[in-house]
Amino acid sequence: MIIQAKVINVSQTVTGKSATTGKDWANKGILLGWEDEDGEQFIRAQVAENIWHEYALQVSDVGCIALRFRTIQSRKSNYVYNDIRIVPLPNRQ
């Protein structure tokens, strides 16, 4: 899904190591906002630091952003949650 949104806030980078793959990761939390027929809308998404760098957007910038949604169930707690990620924009030729 691609949306046109304003960057409201960008969190500090959080780092860790994947328990599944053993790979290091570095993510940021991004708060995005836009207006539609129902008024102001907001969504918080995670993004890998290197992907966010490719977008080159700063707080208050408006741009096209690609989002991926998936539902995940925790193996430990059986808790179900939605994972919203900012992903690279598809190549448009």
Pin down the residues of each PLM region:
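Single-stranded nucleic acid-binding surfaces, predominantly the OB-fold ssDNA-binding core
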Residues: 1-93
